C-alpha cells in the first residue's frame, strides 16, 4: 500500500485526531470475515430441510455486496410447507427490499423485509390448499452483522470466542411461551392438552382447533388464524473476534441444551462440528425425531479457518471421538480468556410482536411521495394514495437520494393481517 510518506518531497496531510480514531475503529471491521459452514442430520420422518447459500449478492456482479444465508425448516404433517419455504422464502424476503440502497440501509430494512417475506411465503403456500406446516429459521450473515428471523422452535444460538452463548431466536412452543399462550387465547383459540378417556390430560400444550404445539409457523391451513407466520427477528453485530452459529431443528434441542450443543463442538471446523452436535444428540436421546444441524463460523480474515477455542491436543481428542465413537471427558473446551470488550456482541434490533401493523408500520404515506408503491406482501404495485399501511417515520431506511417509506400493505393483505390478529376470518380474503 502506497503512502504519502513514500513520495519524495511531499508531506503527509494532517488529519484531525477524531478522524484518525474513527478510521482505526472502522478499520478493524473493514475486511469482511470468512464464512465457513457445515451441515449434518439424520432423518426419522424425513420432514427436515435446510438451506445453505453462502455466496449471495445484493447487487449482481458486485462482490462488496456479498452476504450469506442459512436456514432450517422442520416440517410437520408432511413436507410440502418445508419444501415450499426452502424454495421461496429467501426470494420473497429479497423482493421486499428495494434495489439500489446501500449496505447500511439494507441492514436497517432487513428486519421488516423478513417479516414481509415470511407472510408472503405463508400466503402463497396456503393458496396451494395443502395442510402441512413448517418451522422456519432464516439467518442472514453480512460481514459481522447477523440477522435471524424465526417461527416455531428451530433454535439458533451464537457461541463467541469468549465462551458466551446467546440465544438469537425465541421458541414459539405453547408449553414454554406464556406470552404466546395469552395471545392465542385472546385471539379466540383454546390452549389445552390432549384429553384421554376419563378426562386425563397428556402431552404438551396444544392450540385448538388443529392441535398444534406451536403458535407460529408457515402453512398449517387447517388450524386457526391465530397461528401466525410473523417471525421473531433479532439482529446483532459481532465483535471482530467473530463467532459460531448453531442452527438446528428441535430434534437437536430436545436432546441438548444450548450450552451442551456449543460445548460439544468447540474447536472443530464447522463440518465436523455439525456432525458432532447431531451425534451427541443421538447419544443423549436416540433418534426420536428428525435431527438437522447447520454450523456457521464467522472468522476474522486474518485467522485460520478453525475456531481457536481449543488447543490442538484437545482438537485431536474431539476428532478421535467423532471418528471412533468415544469422547474423553477432557475434550470439552474451556472458556476462552478473551476480554468482554473484545468479544462483545452489540444488539442492533429485536422485535417479536405478532401484530403486522407494529412490524411493518401503521401510518399512511406522505403526499410528497407520488410514485407507485408496492405491497410488501403480495408484491403488487399500488396507485399513489391507495389504501396502504406504511412506516413513514422519518425514512429510517433510505436510498442515497430519496427516503424509502415502505414496506406497504395493500387493502387485501391488510385483511389477512386482521385475520391473523383475530379480528376477522380470511378464508376468502388472502391477497390475489
Swiss-Prot record:
<keyword id="KW-0378">Hydrolase</keyword>
<comment type="similarity">
    <text>Belongs to the PP2C family.</text>
</comment>
<dbReference type="GO" id="GO:0046872">
    <property type="term" value="F:metal ion binding"/>
</dbReference>
<dbReference type="Pfam" id="PF00481">
    <property type="entry name" value="PP2C"/>
</dbReference>
<dbReference type="InterPro" id="IPR036457">
    <property type="entry name" value="PPM-type-like_dom_sf"/>
</dbReference>
<keyword id="KW-0460">Magnesium</keyword>
<protein>
    <recommendedName>
        <fullName>Probable protein phosphatase 2C 33</fullName>
        <ecNumber>3.1.3.16</ecNumber>
    </recommendedName>
</protein>
<dbReference type="InterPro" id="IPR015655">
    <property type="entry name" value="PP2C"/>
</dbReference>
<dbReference type="InterPro" id="IPR001932">
    <property type="entry name" value="PPM-type_phosphatase-like_dom"/>
</dbReference>
<feature type="domain" description="PPM-type phosphatase">
    <location>
        <begin position="27"/>
        <end position="298"/>
    </location>
</feature>
<keyword id="KW-0904">Protein phosphatase</keyword>
<dbReference type="GO" id="GO:0004722">
    <property type="term" value="F:protein serine/threonine phosphatase activity"/>
</dbReference>
<feature type="binding site">
    <location>
        <position position="74"/>
    </location>
    <ligand>
        <name>Mn(2+) 2</name>
    </ligand>
</feature>
<dbReference type="GO" id="GO:1902531">
    <property type="term" value="P:regulation of intracellular signal transduction"/>
</dbReference>
<feature type="binding site">
    <location>
        <position position="250"/>
    </location>
    <ligand>
        <name>Mn(2+) 2</name>
    </ligand>
</feature>
<keyword id="KW-0464">Manganese</keyword>
<keyword id="KW-0479">Metal-binding</keyword>
<feature type="binding site">
    <location>
        <position position="74"/>
    </location>
    <ligand>
        <name>Mn(2+) 1</name>
    </ligand>
</feature>
<feature type="binding site">
    <location>
        <position position="289"/>
    </location>
    <ligand>
        <name>Mn(2+) 2</name>
    </ligand>
</feature>
<feature type="binding site">
    <location>
        <position position="75"/>
    </location>
    <ligand>
        <name>Mn(2+) 1</name>
    </ligand>
</feature>
